[in-house]
Amino acid sequence: MLRLKNDRFIRALLRQPVDRTPVWIMRQAGRYLPEYRQLREKVPNFMAFCKTPELACEATLQPLRRFPLDAAIIFSDILTIPDAMGVDLHIAPTVGPVIRNPVRSAQDVNRLQMPAVEEALSYLFDAIRLTVKALDHRVPLIGFAGSPWTLACYMTEGQSSKTFLTARAMLYQQPDVFHTLLQKLTTLTIAYLNAQIKAGADVVMLFDTWGGLLTPSLYRQFSLDYLSQIAAEVVRQKNGRKIPLIFFTKNGGQWLESIANSGCDAVGLDWTTDIGQARRRVGDRVALQGNLDPAILLSNPESISTAAVDILKSYGQGSGHVFNLGHGIDPSTPIENVAALVEAVQNFSIKNEKPISSYYR
């Protein structure tokens, strides 16, 4: 088994020694890059773009050509699973995802397809294989999925929302139906992540974007319990290598201890949680990822550098920190500000004695 030339990201996720804090950026492949916008002109339909392995591979690689990032994340979308289940999904340019046949009854849930993941989503696995070959072991590749709760939000609401009131009301009105939907999504998500690992993903991540909308009791019942099931059933070793698992719940800081106990290796933090306090709360149970406010990337390099250093200082000495944003990068972010962020993290991250890589030993 060939070693990664840069396994800093994986070592940090496993809380092994690192020479500096690794950095990558959520949505690092995307609309803030002019080369991505040019690539999208070839296939304006977003889902068609995602389903073209060569284009998804190219989009994945683009940010690594500009910035010395410590990980790549496969270009895709969290709604690939609902799409494969037969919902009528459209990505509207100014609206976002629209599902024309929302799932709001037991009959709707029963009509959903449970496809063979490796066939229905083969385009994603082909994209991963192409990307792994193109990366040539330079950095790890992250695979990902949306959390069952977050996917269910879109499927029941029918479109994006700030509150997902329809989805939340359904929890109270038809809890059994919602649990059935979540279990179907969980079963497919486990198969989906395992197939990504089989195709070559080195790390997998679950985005629970809308978990923070729930009450503490409902969060555990309708989101975290399903995340824990995924953690228990996703492959965590491959060819003698550990496959780290990251959970990210936006606005989930109040449940940090519960998330840390759910079976993941690392917890992503949004910008509303102090990372130093978070580290004290979780101890050595998990690594932490985050958590710069994406809005600061719309300011200036000096402010960005100061904010990045503040986060690094707040986390403190030792491994177990992956620097990232607290959410996805805004499409209007200037490229020079991204470069300033990556440079600041690399220059100012607290350095430890450079270790001998233990990941592939």
Swiss-Prot record:
Its EC number is 4.1.1.37. It holds the Pfam family URO-D. Substrate binds at residues 27-31, 46, 77, 154, 209, 327. CDD domains: URO-D (cd00717). Its main location: cytoplasm. Keywords: Cytoplasm, Decarboxylase, Lyase, Porphyrin biosynthesis. Pathway: Porphyrin-containing compound metabolism; protoporphyrin-IX biosynthesis; coproporphyrinogen-III from 5-aminolevulinate: step 4/4. GO terms for cellular component: cytosol. It is found in: Cytoplasm. The record marks 77 as: Transition state stabilizer. The keyword Cytoplasm applies. Belongs to the uroporphyrinogen decarboxylase family. Catalyzes the decarboxylation of four acetate groups of uroporphyrinogen-III to yield coproporphyrinogen-III. Homodimer. This is Uroporphyrinogen decarboxylase. The lineage of its organism: Bacteria, Pseudomonadati, Pseudomonadota, Gammaproteobacteria, Legionellales.
